[in-house]
Amino acid sequence: MLKIGVIGCGFIGGQICRAIDKGVINAELYALSDSSESKVLELTTCLKRYSPASMTIEELLQNVDFVIESASQKAVRLIVPQALEAGRDVMVMSVGALADEELRKRLFRLAEQNNCKLYFPSGAVAGIDGINSASAAEILSVTLTTRKPPMGLAGAPHVEALGIELETIEKETLLFEGPASEAVKAFPANVNVAATISLAGIGFERTKVRVIADPTLSRNVHEITVEGEFGKLSTRVENLPSPENPKTSYLAALSAISTLKKILSPVQIGT
């Protein structure tokens, strides 16, 4: 049975661990790692089937078969290269880190050299399968419009740099418009989906992103519009935010769980 190691015990990491513990995913939850030992302890006390060990990154990489990063873009930069060098397959949740072209090329090269797989779940959006299919021909444009309740954008570097007072926003307000390469830096905890869309389609510079704060919303809304030789594709997802972290949509965690199930399944459905 595949031994899983999870790095990052926040909402997404926790949901993945609970799914494995309940038998939704046919794998062994072997190890956890987090900068906060209290988060590891809190998560392990919720589990019934498995008692994963709390390990350092180095210990985890030596003892598991498959690594799940659900921590941060910083963790992707520091840990994922080590995992690939150790010959481990990796699922990356903080996909925004791959806007860094040098890092992206390095990870892809390491995966090839060490015969490893890198997995990037669809996250909190629908339509990645369609974008993947459309990329077999020419894609002309890709636009992501993200709408969130203002406080769901709290702490974003773009918000803090401009001194935007989110609590004073009373109507729909455009906070950012630009390429995905800049969006993932401006809102690293909010628009990881922009990175996934970029990887599936026309890249970080050509993928356009709009971030809107809307006080009338109680959900995180992602709209994708793609035009190309195939025609036009439009999707809209209204995500319930995580009760633990309003920056994260519940669907993002479900996407990770679904990806793991697909990896382990003999039957593959969809692009």
Swiss-Prot record:
Its EC number is 1.4.1.21. The keyword NADP applies. It holds the Pfam family Asp_DH_C. It is an enzyme of class 1 (oxidoreductase). NAD(+) binds at A124, N192. SUPFAM superfamilies: Glyceraldehyde-3-phosphate dehydrogenase-like, C-terminal domain, NAD(P)-binding Rossmann-fold domains. The active site is at H222. Gene3D superfamilies: Dihydrodipicolinate Reductase, domain 2, NAD(P)-binding Rossmann-like Domain. One of its GO terms (biological process) is NAD biosynthetic process. The keyword Oxidoreductase applies. Belongs to the L-aspartate dehydrogenase family. Specifically catalyzes the NAD or NADP-dependent dehydrogenation of L-aspartate to iminoaspartate. The iminoaspartate product is unstable in aqueous solution and can decompose to oxaloacetate and ammonia. This is L-aspartate dehydrogenase. It comes from Methanosarcina barkeri (strain Fusaro / DSM 804). The gene is nadX.
